[in-house]
Amino acid sequence: MECNLAQAKQWVSALDQRRFERALQGSGDAFQHVLAIVPLLLHLNHPQLPGYVIHAPSGIASFLASDYQKKWLTNEYGIHYADHKPSTLKSAVNFHEVFPPILGVYVMGSFGSISQTSSSDLDTWICVRDGLSLDEYTLLTQKAKRISEWAMQFNVEINFYLMDQQRFRNEHYADPLTIENSGSAQYMLLLDEFYRSAVRLAGKPLLWLHLWVENEKDYEKEVARLITEGEIDPNDWVDFGGLGQFSANEYFGASLWHLYKGIDSPYKSVLKILLLEAYSKEYPNTCLIARTFKRDLLAGNTNPDHHFDPYIAILAKVTQYLTALSEFKRLDFVHRCFYVKATEDFARYQANNWRIRYMEILAQEWGWSAETVKHLNKRPFWKIKAVKENHDNIMKFLMLSYRNLVEFARKHHIHSSVVPQDINILSRKLYTAFEELPGKVSLLNTQISHNLSEAHLTFVEVRGNKHFKDGWYLINQPIHHIMFSKERVIEYGESLNKLVSWAYFNHLLTEKTELSIFSKNVTLSTLQRFVTNLRQSFPSTIAKQPKNSDLLNQCEIRSLFIAINLTTDPTSKVEEVLTGISSRDLFSFGSLEQSLVGSIDFTYRNVWNEIRTLHFEGQNAILLALKVLSNKIYRGVNRPDSIQVYCYSERYRQDLRQLVMGLVNRCVSIQVGDIQQPCQTSRLRVAGKNWQLFFEDRGISLQEIGNESVCNEAESAVDFDEVLQTPIEDGETNQESRRYPPEMDAFASEGFLQFFFEDNSDHSFNVYILDESNHLEIYRHCDGEKDEKVREINQLYQNAKQEGDKNPYNIVQHNFNYPQFYQLQNGKNGISIVPFKFRQMNK
């Protein structure tokens, strides 16, 4: 394809202007103001201006201030800007005239596309010159952060990313993974997204957009040739390089990243992860959208079907892929996601808005009825059944794409390019958001509907019905309107505690909700008191995302709510009236020696911001509850911020509450290290039997006195002997063989397989393995390379489901319980634990 750079500049500039105009259509004055002023604030570093940081580098290459920017400077701050006389500002502005630190500023993503809405953020790349010092980089980062804070005053969210031109050539990841930064999860796929959507706000043009090369792997050679022959001056351009290094190794990390983004942007993520799936289908000859855009633009095709809109192009690519597979159900859901995303501001749009007009055309092409369009337009006001159906479909189709990409990686023996620390964080974020576990309260995506509150909620208990399994059912109608049927049920829970928690944390249950109950065991007044106590113990809104630092540690309990005798109350059937009894007699009461604690329910929020529930019932409920609690309060961790205990029994309410609260507080205090457990262990008499409680490193063990059988089951740990090749030495005593660094306790996390590497002086290493239940396995003096062990274990995990019974290591693969790897380091202050890092990254 022949194309001169002068002509290419005109076409690229025209496309920038076209996207810029589209971005402003439907946007408010505040958005337009921020967009106009941001480049100026990056260019200047004046004490009076927003974003000022003393000594911060400033100055954008080839910057020319607009009339709007000059007027704003003069009117707001009395500063007079001279375009061609930067020296006039030198006394007030840190101005880099000869070598500006900022080569270019570009906004990317949904900007100017059909998916842009009033709530869309501005993902902005700041390309800095090579050789910027660490101090300069830090100061410029601080300046960008302050500009972001200034923009938030106008309700405009800007995410700045400092980039250098070698980032993608070297695959270095200077910035850690955050809620907006994909870290090491993407390289070429991120560059593909940038090139297909970038709009230059200031600075130098992007060379790649102007230069066509038939084979992308020849891009660097072609650029070098043009420089040698004097056809281009590299100082006139910003060049992040070509897409020739694109590798299928990225699919795994990118799929995790888009699943993670799907927590907050579900409709967009359905499209993006499906694009990855479509890309993988074309492997190894993947046709990237950025290449398609550039080919059409430089060929002079200024009005292609995709309109140079990245999201319209994604839709076309995904449609072609799913149609070829005859997966029309998935395609219909993709259409719905696309429509919902594009019409997010439907209520604010005017009838002549180009986005609305385009979506009306697509709806007709898809053969939608007027009822379908009307239903989707009312999406912000959907109630629970429509929201649940939509939420379940989003989860189903996200996970289907993810599994297809995992299968693709397995089939082609692809290794992930994501570094272990990022995979640890990503997998734990996804585990908390997507993994369905017993007792875990599933939170519906808050982006689907604005208001799920219900005027009436009825809780129905079912026992011994051949048509319904035992448990609790929730219906969003008053009790006198109920014709109980499966069609009317909106949610099921094995325990009342979990069902009430689900309704409360998903905002169906509010202070205005009228409650009803149909149960032989729980009265309406008890239910109402329980709901009131739950509301007093927890805010209904949970913080969106846990911090990365929290995710790198174990999931400590942050807030704990305990309900005694909520669903089973032995005191209501007590016929003996005893006086002068000890509080401990309540666990072995009267001549029948029955425990007056019939049920205990836990509701707790952990530092990963999960809501979990536990239900214990029967004569040994108190013992089971204490044992499980001790396993979840890890040695040496912080004490929970709050522990609330409530009792709902008919009799002995305060006595039972005080007794259980005392035991719980003692259990917690021993586990966190507030008090030292004496050698003589605690004893309890429960339901006519004496029990001894042993407080150990990993929780309480229970033993009936006079009976040598220990209640806690001994489960065997995962056998990784063949991977690590060195079992525990025969000469070690059992006590010596079980010694492990106690610092590991702070990292123990349920649900994950964790590996801790410890280097020895003879260049071998020890490996401590904690399985999903935190059972410990130790391998000492292992040989070989740790990098290879990590890759081998990851491969074993990846193949676990396919190999079935042939899996020699008993790895249990769930959706996001990826093996986690850590390194123990000896320092002056003792042992520290850090995420494991490869010595050499895979390219």
Swiss-Prot record:
Q: Which UniProt keywords are listed?
A: ATP-binding, cAMP biosynthesis, Competence, Cytoplasm, Lyase, Nucleotide-binding
Among the entry's GO cellular component annotations, what is one?
Answer: cytoplasm
Q: What induces it?
A: Expressed during exponential growth; expression decreases 10-fold on shifting to starvation media.
PROSITE patterns membership: ADENYLATE_CYCLASE_1_1 (PS01092), ADENYLATE_CYCLASE_1_2 (PS01093)
* Top-level division of the source organism's lineage: Bacteria
EC no. given is 4.6.1.1
In the record, biological process GO terms are:
cAMP biosynthetic process; establishment of competence for transformation
- Indicate where this protein resides in the cell: Cytoplasm
Region of interest (Regulatory), residue spans: 549-843
Please write the reaction equations for the catalytic activity of this protein.
ATP = 3',5'-cyclic AMP + diphosphate
Q: What is its main location?
A: cytoplasm
Give a yes or no for keyword ATP-binding in this entry: yes
The answer to whether the entry has keyword Phosphoprotein is no
Q: What class of enzyme is it?
A: lyase
Q: Which GO terms describe its molecular function?
A: adenylate cyclase activity; ATP binding
PANTHER family tied to this protein: ADENYLATE CYCLASE
Q: Which family does it belong to?
A: Belongs to the adenylyl cyclase class-1 family.
Name of the featured protein: Adenylate cyclase
